[in-house]
């Protein structure tokens, strides 16, 4: 690569703070595509910490198979692609159509050892090429901010997995490079508008400055209310009834008993109409506040959710990488009228904490997380913190742990994600064989479910959650949920667990449309 000739210019403006990010998102973004809301909250206190919104995007980056499509959404984005074309290695084919660029990456040999596979040219390099074009001399936070999703099916590019059909338009990954960010710090009660200028074009700089002023003015206005859409018939359907799902669980248990795998996480899908996803997200956030909450508005789909589980988190300064395995689930203790019974709730928690099956399953997945990190972390740097604690949500409680390690030199956050995907709590162990069996029995792509949503930056930081407790919407909402199966699982309990996990999202959609 040649020396970086391009500088990123950051334009920042303070703006009035407002405590309701969902209302702000509705007010500023309405139904525009390539917009994204990412939120974090403190689990136990249920307090909002930070909300990041992509208000305007410069480029939409998506991938299917070994192709990456880069679509400019402004002159700012077009300038990046003009520079990018000059930086693409000859091993990668490049096509242009209507200002879009399509990159064709060589297919990865599946029989390569893990290290060679990790360093092979891959679709992840599309992001690295863009980052290498620019200098961020002042090390401004979020100067290049990529927000979006990695689908579960992205792993097919790297592993020998069955080819499946899917009815969803969800790409293997879909990310937006932010042009205009809004960052809300709920602890300090501050609001910052940040624009990233990737060009020296004077007219584009003028437009972006005017856009920043326009957003500030809008934030001084009374925020628009989220429109209500009423539905009289809101039937819940599924791709598997209880008997069918239970039958798959029993078949997989036989394979566990034969020693083919130790654990596996089959899932099923629930469907219901959802004409107003943002209203449903608002209800979900209120009823089930979670460490990670997200609302992604794409031209092909809307994705929203409240996930309890971090996928992968990486801090470039410390080079610390974190996994947060969740395994072990119980419903909250409630009376017949739905109120929380604290005594019953504590007894359920005690039973879960001391249940041999749940503890064995949880520790198996903690060990899998340790193994995932072993490939990419410095020897001796891995450790487990917060072993087997309990996080509680509106409908369920979970056993959780945190596994931490220090990333090896020469690797970045995208190497780490590629090595660890998909997370063991959504696949099983051994991971690749579990994913093969999931494909065989589920018979269709998972799409966004079980992948990850979040962001990474040019400075190397990455923060993602597993895409669970979520709804993927193309007019109809698809809510997918699974259960971790081990040799002594009780199929009826696991069938109920899959519905319990989906219930918070189902209820939010129903309550938003009554």
Curated annotation (Swiss-Prot):
Signal peptide: none annotated. The keyword Magnesium applies. InterPro entries: ADC_synthase (IPR005801), Anth_synth_I-like (IPR019999), Anth_synth_I_N (IPR006805), Anth_synth_I_TrpE (IPR005257), Chorismate_C (IPR015890). GO terms for molecular function: anthranilate synthase activity; metal ion binding. It comes from the Bacteria. Pathway: Amino-acid biosynthesis; L-tryptophan biosynthesis; L-tryptophan from chorismate: step 1/5. L-tryptophan binds at residues 40, 291-293. Chorismate binds at residues 328-329, 449, 469, 482-484. It catalyses: chorismate + L-glutamine = anthranilate + pyruvate + L-glutamate + H(+). One of its GO terms (biological process) is L-tryptophan biosynthetic process. Pfam families: Anth_synt_I_N, Chorismate_bind. Gene3D superfamilies: Anthranilate synthase. Keywords: Amino-acid biosynthesis, Aromatic amino acid biosynthesis, Lyase, Magnesium, Metal-binding, Plasmid, Tryptophan biosynthesis. Part of a heterotetrameric complex that catalyzes the two-step biosynthesis of anthranilate, an intermediate in the biosynthesis of L-tryptophan. In the first step, the glutamine-binding beta subunit (TrpG) of anthranilate synthase (AS) provides the glutamine amidotransferase activity which generates ammonia as a substrate that, along with chorismate, is used in the second step, catalyzed by the large alpha subunit of AS (TrpE) to produce anthranilate. In the absence of TrpG, TrpE can synthesize anthranilate directly from chorismate and high concentrations of ammonia. Belongs to the anthranilate synthase component I family. This is Anthranilate synthase component 1. It comes from Buchnera aphidicola subsp. Rhopalosiphum maidis.
